[in-house]
Regions:
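Gly-rich Lys/Arg/Thr-decorated short loops/hinges at beta-loop-alpha junctions or inter-strand turns
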Residues: 1-12
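Conserved "landmark" site that anchors the functional core of diverse proteins
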Residues: 11-15, 36
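Short, small-residue-enriched loops and turns at beta-alpha junctions
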Residues: 16, 74-75, 175-177
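Histidine-anchored nucleotide/phosphate-binding helix
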Residues: 17-34
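Long, highly charged amphipathic alpha-helices
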Residues: 22-26, 53, 153
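Hydrophobic alpha-helical positions that pack around
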Residues: 37-151, 157-164, 172
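Ferredoxin-type iron-sulfur electron-transfer modules and their immediate structural context
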Residues: 125, 151, 158-196
């Protein structure tokens, strides 16, 4: 799943552009662990740079295929991906396993690679910092940020808050929640920090 469900978060696509090999190795390890014979990389068609990067590294691998999906919300949700690739609708109570699928994102796949090759546990998180940031409006992509790192430190690393702001949303604009900047820290569930 390279379809960033939340529109402001870009770290999964950024990881794919930066290091497609770590992700492909993660796919291969996941296929071996689950016994899967085929893997599909679901990605929005608009992400041309990431698509080119992954296709370059897939040459010769017949069991991993790229599927370009529409740029619409909530295309990144696992049930929507399964429907887009296989045409199967899952009930709200059903999980991907009910369709004989496992859906993993780029960060999870890179963590699988690090666990297998380096014996590294998941002790950090990839984060997108975006919004009213002095470092510019473009998303700031931070990789392997230690869990427990204050969000305030990440915002400062990206240039700091640009003037007055409304709130800091941890996560994405649709599923994130506002948190107190003085107490917010990176958790295993953090995906982004949005300064509004």
């Amino acid at each position: 799943n390279y379809v960033e469900c939340e529109p402001a978060l870009h770290h999964n696509i950024g990881l794919l552009e930066k290091d497609p090999e770590i992700v492909i190795r993660g796919i291969e390890y996941a296929m071996e662990a689950t016994g899967a014979k085929k893997a599909y990389i679901a990605i929005k068609g608009k992400n041309k740079k990431a698509i080119a990067a992954i296709k370059k590294h897939l040459s010769g691998l017949k069991n991993i295929e790229v599927r370009e999906l529409k740029d619409m919300y909530p295309m990144g949700e696992e049930r929507a991906i399964i429907h887009a690739i296989f045409g199967n609708w899952l009930e709200p109570t059903q999980l991907p396993l009910d369709a004989k699928c496992v859906v993993l994102n780029a960060e999870t796949l890179s963590n699988i690679t690090r666990a297998v090759e380096d014996r590294k546990p998941v002790i950090d998180k990839d984060i997108t910092v975006v919004g009213k940031i002095k470092g510019g409006n473009a998303p700031h992509l931070l990789y392997e940020v230690p869990i427990g790192t204050p969000i305030k430190n990440l915002i400062e690393e990206c240039g700091g808050i640009d003037g007055e702001y409304g709130e800091v949303v941890i996560g994405g604009p649709y599923t994130g929640k506002a948190e107190d900047l003085e107490n917010a820290v990176v958790t295993k569930m953090s995906g982004g920090a949005i300064v509004t």
